[in-house]
Amino acid sequence: MYQPDFPPVPFRLGLYPVVDSVQWIERLLDAGVRTLQLRIKDRRDEEVEADVVAAIALGRRYNARLFINDYWRLAIKHQAYGVHLGQEDLQATDLNAIRAAGLRLGVSTHDDMEIDVALAARPSYIALGHVFPTQTKQMPSAPQGLEQLARHVERLADYPTVAIGGISLARAPAVIATGVGSIAVVSAITQAADWRLATAQLLEIAGVGDE
């Protein structure tokens, strides 16, 4: 049963781009996307705070679900919609502070053991990856593939789930067919020849998410 220890999110979050700049956040919100993540890596809090503030303000303006990757203190300080954490960040993060601030929490997983760890934290949603080989980041684990993804989705039947990792426009329909509630994409949009067209096509496949 879906009983998160953090504020809930819609069962289907729809298309979920993960981007590294405020410029991309603004473009995608203007294009109709309503679930996004700002992921800026390996910088100090003071170096990213202005971007976090600007992204959160844009999210509010568009009534969108904006998650901040990793920088949970800034997300709390500026009241983001939510925070997304990798497995490696869970132990170093004050989950009680995130919960007390009323922020949603998403957690990355790569196998059954990590799903168990995520479930113990009772987050708002669980991300399942990486589905396919990806060039976006170095991954210590092997790609899950569609069959494994479907098995995880079945196990987490009443939990909001997000598939991530190597999901292209061509692969997106098969990913959605597993029953997963959302697809997170990076290069499928940011490296597309026509990002507006790619975004529109992905929205047709994955939707904007439930209200």
UniProtKB/Swiss-Prot annotation:
Does Transferase show up as a keyword for this record? Answer: yes
The residues that the entry says bind Mg(2+) are D70, D89
| Protein name according to UniProt | Thiamine-phosphate synthase
* UniProt source species: Shigella boydii serotype 18 (strain CDC 3083-94 / BS512)
Q: Catalytic activity annotated for this protein?
A: 2-[(2R,5Z)-2-carboxy-4-methylthiazol-5(2H)-ylidene]ethyl phosphate + 4-amino-2-methyl-5-(diphosphooxymethyl)pyrimidine + 2 H(+) = thiamine phosphate + CO2 + diphosphate; 2-(2-carboxy-4-methylthiazol-5-yl)ethyl phosphate + 4-amino-2-methyl-5-(diphosphooxymethyl)pyrimidine + 2 H(+) = thiamine phosphate + CO2 + diphosphate; 4-methyl-5-(2-phosphooxyethyl)-thiazole + 4-amino-2-methyl-5-(diphosphooxymethyl)pyrimidine + H(+) = thiamine phosphate + diphosphate
Query: How and how many cofactors are bound, per the record note?
Result: Binds 1 Mg(2+) ion per subunit.
Q: Which terms does the record give in the GO molecular function aspect?
A: magnesium ion binding; thiamine-phosphate diphosphorylase activity
- Give the pathway listed in the UniProt entry for this protein: Cofactor biosynthesis; thiamine diphosphate biosynthesis; thiamine phosphate from 4-amino-2-methyl-5-diphosphomethylpyrimidine and 4-methyl-5-(2-phosphoethyl)-thiazole: step 1/1
